[in-house]
Amino acid sequence: MNAVGIEVSKGKSMVAIMRPFGEIVSAPFEIKHTAGDIHSLVELINSVEGESRIVMEHTGRYYEVLAHQLSKANLFVSAINPKLIKDFDNDSLRKVKSDKADAVKIARYALDKWQNLKQYNVMDELRNQLKTMNRQFGFYMKHKTAMKNNLIGILDQTYPGVNTYFDSPARSDGSQKWVDFASTYWHVDCVRKMSLNAFIDHYQNWCKRKKYNFSQSKAEEIYGKAKELVPVLPKDAITKLIIKQAVYQLNSASTTVESLRTLMNETASKLPEYPVVMAMKGVGTSLGSQLMAEIGDVSRFTHKSAITAFAGVDPGVNESGSYEQKSVPTSKRGSSDLRKTLFQVMDVLIKTHPQDDPVYQFLDKKRAQGKPYYVYMTAGANKFLRIYYGRVKEYLSSLPES
């Protein structure tokens, strides 16, 4: 029974090997994340008599190299939430923070939780890919929003309000009607310098070329508004270049977002719980894949309260003696990305109001009681996660073992 504790950092790690009752098999030593050092570590672990289990914190992306390579060497590897390691065995007044001390602490954690350690496996790699894509998706969504606001800010000086003319959703290639329109009619003079009939013909040809729906009443409305607008920047080559560059940057970010959205759905469809998640109300191919990316493997949660605590939407408790606080904020100690996705799901439910859905019924009930927005949204997210946990776990248990 050998516990291998690994304190992972960027490019290198500290390793300690222990046995029960504090027996030190190998004092903490450093290895580089190179093929040679990892091979030497595998040989050392295999040379130690008895069963060995390796535990490391899943800190950022640093641990993945070791977890992957050690798993390929047929060793038992378990990646643990750093919060669990931090809170483990804090029974000393001394505060020691070093890689060597942390490696020993992780090894002691492995010994204490020996029977409950979950092995890192190939499915975890697929989920890690999905989670990485989701984080990239979030990054590019923020970038897209910044580029969109930048373009609108410039257009307010050449064609105010043009971004409000169309509300069509983005296409699969990331293009949007208002952006394409602003790219062609980048200045208000591009519209009002033409006659009404000339603009209608030009706009109709543009819609046909770009494969958008044409409406004559919309064309007349656009032309009428253009007559009243007052631009700030002149209609010249410099202004056109500024706008074209802003449009290009927005289209580039939007294309990346949509390609990631498609790839995430394709990856999520390989997970066993995909059909169950897609069948839930408020969830589509985009939010569904984001949920699966952030929640991960449901089987690692022992009960419903564990998954709500992981998301940070579990109700807080503040009691001491005879004092008991009635309204306590949620813990918010879990994944902020998961909470964001859950709030988006709740928003979809409120907008679509499926009357037969228990989560929507719960949300509607809390709203009718006059609960504040964040209270009923968080409560709905909590209920949704509990239902998610129950349905997915029941479905996974019904599948034949592979």
PLM feature spans:
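A detector of single, family-specific signature residues
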Residues: M1-S402
